[in-house]
Amino acid sequence: MIVQLDPASISFPPAATALHEPNGLLAVGGDLSPGRLIHAYQQGIFPWFSESDPILWWSPNPRAVFFPDQIHTSRSLAKTNRKPNWQMSINCNFAEVVRACADERADKEGTWITEEMIEAYCKLHQLGYAHSVEIWFDNELAGGLYGISVGRAFCGESMFHYKTDASKIALLRFAQYFKKHGGQLIDCQVGNPHLFSLGAVNLHRERFLMKLNIAQQKKMPDTFWQARELPLPGEL
């Protein structure tokens, strides 16, 4: 049975009570207030719904994740990544990254990144919880990703690319940077062939929640999410 959330409370039912079909559906309702969203991600729960739906909350089993030191890099991607034209930045253009992700998904299959979602995540960004990674090619935005920080875990929400391989390079370089500074886990929610080809693995929900709980016992260094251009791969 799906739980209807109490508008006056930010609490959620235990993730283990989520439905088997559709996989991971846990609750409906509530809002996208910063407090509720932060609490959800800390519990391994995330919102995912279309414009015509009520707010739906999920915690699927299994859960797809990346371990930062296990991103798969093909020869061609490694060669592309070495080109000096690429540059990475962090938190330099959050709103544009989110909107680019929304536009890319809308072109393919319709987007769940609605205006309501964009506004909610921009608020989280202003509060220091939501972050973007930008990849530039010859000083033009070429791709990127965004997500939510939960201690030393990063809950990825979406990626986009204007240029071939740009989103892969964003993930690869971010994972290297994240690992070097103590990052432990990159959540990618629900796996697909593309994510698995890059090194994502499925964890049983119970194991994922255990790792998420461990990761959020410590914060990333204070300067980690500071908006800036980041060094070249060999200097990360």
Swiss-Prot record:
Entry-linked InterPro entries: Acyl_CoA_acyltransferase (IPR016181), Leu/Phe-tRNA_Trfase (IPR004616), Leu/Phe-tRNA_Trfase_C (IPR042203), Leu/Phe-tRNA_Trfase_N (IPR042221)
Enzyme category, top tier: transferase
Enzyme Commission (EC) number: 2.3.2.6
Any one Gene Ontology cellular component term annotated for this protein: cytoplasm
Catalytically driven reaction(s): N-terminal L-lysyl-[protein] + L-leucyl-tRNA(Leu) = N-terminal L-leucyl-L-lysyl-[protein] + tRNA(Leu) + H(+); N-terminal L-arginyl-[protein] + L-leucyl-tRNA(Leu) = N-terminal L-leucyl-L-arginyl-[protein] + tRNA(Leu) + H(+); L-phenylalanyl-tRNA(Phe) + an N-terminal L-alpha-aminoacyl-[protein] = an N-terminal L-phenylalanyl-L-alpha-aminoacyl-[protein] + tRNA(Phe)
GO BP terms: protein catabolic process
Compartment(s) where it occurs, according to its Swiss-Prot or TrEMBL record: Cytoplasm
GO MF term list: leucyl-tRNA--protein transferase activity
Keyword annotations: Acyltransferase, Cytoplasm, Transferase
One Pfam family, short name: Leu_Phe_trans
UniProt similarity note: Belongs to the L/F-transferase family.
Job of this protein: Functions in the N-end rule pathway of protein degradation where it conjugates Leu, Phe and, less efficiently, Met from aminoacyl-tRNAs to the N-termini of proteins containing an N-terminal arginine or lysine.
Entry protein name: Leucyl/phenylalanyl-tRNA--protein transferase
Organism: Idiomarina loihiensis (strain ATCC BAA-735 / DSM 15497 / L2-TR)
Gene that this polypeptide is encoded by: aat
